[in-house]
């Protein structure tokens, strides 16, 4: 299931939405975080997505896709983000514009080969483009505008 989640950052009054994808609720969560960036700087929405991914439990692996000139600097910055246990870097000029067409198949490949249970991205125009296409590639559905996760039980009444 893909979802858009709005999580409150510590000390923030405004909710920062993010997009997430889940393949299973039955096993330990392992999250692939798509890191959005521009000119070598991580988009703040991606940092909010880390906070939400931490609520899922398990490891968080950051995916940095982009041109080689920016991806390395972004990967270094992502490796310093608290909660991120591993950074995956994929460099190609095809990834430089952060378009869904080349990145969604990359996400699909990683989810299938590494058995990620969730994919999370900041709720931005880029996230709204990439995550739904990745859901289609993985034959999954999308759920939008989830505010918070209250329970891990599927049929929870609270």
Where are these regions (language model features)?
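N-terminal glycine-rich FAD/FM-binding segment characteristic of electron-transfer flavoproteins
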Residues: 2-153
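Positively charged, low-complexity/disordered segments
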Residues: 154-158
């Amino acid at each position: 299931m893909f979802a858009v989640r709005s999580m409150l950052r510590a000390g923030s009054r405004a909710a920062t939405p993010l997009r997430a994808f889940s393949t299973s609720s039955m096993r330990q969560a392992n999250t692939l975080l798509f890191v959005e960036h521009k000119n070598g700087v991580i988009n703040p929405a991606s940092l909010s997505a880390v906070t939400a991914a931490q609520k899922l439990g398990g490891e968080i692996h950051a995916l940095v896709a982009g041109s080689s000139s920016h991806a390395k600097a972004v990967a270094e910055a992502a490796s310093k983000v608290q909660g991120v246990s591993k950074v995956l870097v994929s460099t190609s000029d095809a990834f430089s514009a952060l378009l869904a067409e080349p990145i969604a198949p990359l996400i699909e490949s990683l989810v299938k080969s590494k058995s990620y249970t969730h994919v999370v991205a900041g709720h931005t125009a880029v996230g709204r483009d990439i995550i739904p296409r990745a859901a289609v590639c993985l034959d999954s559905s999308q759920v939008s505008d989830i505010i918070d996760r209250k329970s891990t039980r599927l049929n929870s009444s609270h």
